[in-house]
Amino acid sequence: MFCYQCQETAQGKGCTLKGVCGKTAEVAGLQDLLMYLMKGISKLTTTLRKQGVESSTANKFIVDGLFMTITNANFDSSRFVSKIKEAYQLRENLLNELHRLGIHLSLTCDCLTWKSDKVEEMEVKAKEVGILATENEDIRSLCELLTYGVKGMAAYVEHAYNLGFEDTSLYAFMQDALVATTRSDLTVADLTQWVLTCGEYGVKAMALLDKANTSTYGNPEITKVNIGVGKNPGILISGHDLRDIQDLLEQTEGTGIDVYTHGEMLPAHYYPAFKKYKHFVGNYGSAWWKQTSDFETFNGVILFTTNCLVPPRSSATYADRVYTTGSTGFEGFPHIADRKPGGSKDFSALIEHAKKCAPPTEIEHGEIIGGFAHEQVFQLADKVIDAVKSGAIRKFFVMAGCDGRMKSRSYYTEFAEKLPKDTVILTAGCAKYRYNKLPLGEIRGIPRVLDAGQCNDSYSLVMIALKLKEIFGLDDVNELPIAYNIAWYEQKAVIVLLALLYLGVKNIHLGPTLPAFLSPNVAKVLVDNFGIAGIGSVDEDMELFLGK
């Protein structure tokens, strides 16, 4: 195997025996083969689209397939084998549709023809079509950067789809981009442009999801979230999918089961539509990577809706209480099927299971505050502007992104602690867990940590920056008193980064390490054109951002 799509890749170079994430070489290979087949399917859908034919089946298949290959989403080899077999059938159906239209493609790429139902042969083929099949280091780097951006975009598109919101231009771009990675005629300059265009569509995807979430559940509002526990048995829901938590809250109401959020599901508490549920108790635990201890003490049922699943240790006592749904999977964990059109997912098995469990053990108590998405911050605009003009707020620090296991990520806690009292942190994503429980105080009633929500809610931070640019009458968003010190981990962070670059944001500091998939030449392009930089020591970076 060879995989270097996440920040924790082995030795900062690539995983070759087993993923640091826990995925096996077999699963890594099946993911590579699925990606290869989806590139072939995309060749067919892009050809059909030119004839005015849109395949909703293919659109959904590709989005689902991309999401399944995101870091920490799916570790179940049987699910990938099934998906690969579905790809064969879908490919055949699309070819038949083209033939019906009188179009006969030259099937020179065996991504359009290769087929085997034998897992051993799938594994052999995967070695031929994996990342290292592209020999030129810079071309490979740009193709993977584009691919990871598309994977992150697919996650946001899927969440919007689950709420009934679609934009066919996003499907078209994702498929065009997958085809671009197969073209031998594209130069480094060509692929660089594809990467920047990916950022443009990333903004569209985040805007679509923001519209889907806020149209369905209302605009997030300032909310204090309980981090203690109740007395009833509970279900802990992790991941990002708000439609899943809607279904779960509706089905658990009146059952005597409490619902808690975990990790990136914390921002569900900020939406007005969910506040009516009295059994929606609070948030339990910390960031995704601490789940192996958090889940032990939760005592109840755990539901994964999206990525951020960590394989349980062999000694884990909670493994028989974990369920997956959507893109997620792990061998031995029961999987809840997708909802049928107009229906809901059936969580009755989880509810009955939870009734037999003990209530959660309290591991902390108190409250954390969040809900500072764009509309809520716009309502505070006068207060914020006055604080900036008076000097009460000297600078904003965008510290959005992901958390992870590496010890070096303690940098972000120390950075937040050492920031002067006249600065404010703008955050989104699970990076917040490094500092959202610190007593950092307020500035004139404005909390010094403004949490906009999930990783996709980085869109809110962009909207806030653009609004401030407008209010202050500036020509360039980079003239604002905002610094960007972003932590990344997986592919959704990649699309957020590309979106920021598309919007013209410069001098972003990215840590705790720069991506292994950036070749020296590609990294130089990002440094020279956008001022991308890594992180140093906290004191060095503090001086860099604020001066002596």
Swiss-Prot record:
Residues bearing PTM Cysteine persulfide: 402
UniProt keyword Cytoplasm present: yes
EC number(s) given by UniProt: 1.7.99.1
InterPro entries: HCP/CODH (IPR004137), Hydroxylam_reduct (IPR010048), Prismane-like_a/b-sand (IPR016099), Prismane-like_sf (IPR011254), Prismane_a-bundle (IPR016100)
This protein's GO CC annotations: cytoplasm
Keyword Protease: no
Primary localization class, coarse: cytoplasm
Domain of life, source organism: Bacteria
Residues the entry annotates as binding [4Fe-4S] cluster: 3, 6, 15, 21
Signal peptide (from-to): none
Example of a GO biological process term: response to hydrogen peroxide
CDD domains according to UniProt: HCP
Reaction equation(s) it catalyzes: A + NH4(+) + H2O = hydroxylamine + AH2 + H(+)
Subcellular locations according to the entry: Cytoplasm
Cofactor: [4Fe-4S] cluster; hybrid [4Fe-2O-2S] cluster
Keywords assigned: 4Fe-4S, Cytoplasm, Iron, Iron-sulfur, Metal-binding, Oxidoreductase
Cofactor: record remark: Binds 1 [4Fe-4S] cluster. Binds 1 hybrid [4Fe-2O-2S] cluster.
Sites where the protein binds hybrid [4Fe-2O-2S] cluster: 240, 264, 308, 402, 430, 455, 490, 492
Family affiliation: Belongs to the HCP family.
Protein name: Hydroxylamine reductase
The species this protein was found in: Parabacteroides distasonis (strain ATCC 8503 / DSM 20701 / CIP 104284 / JCM 5825 / NCTC 11152)
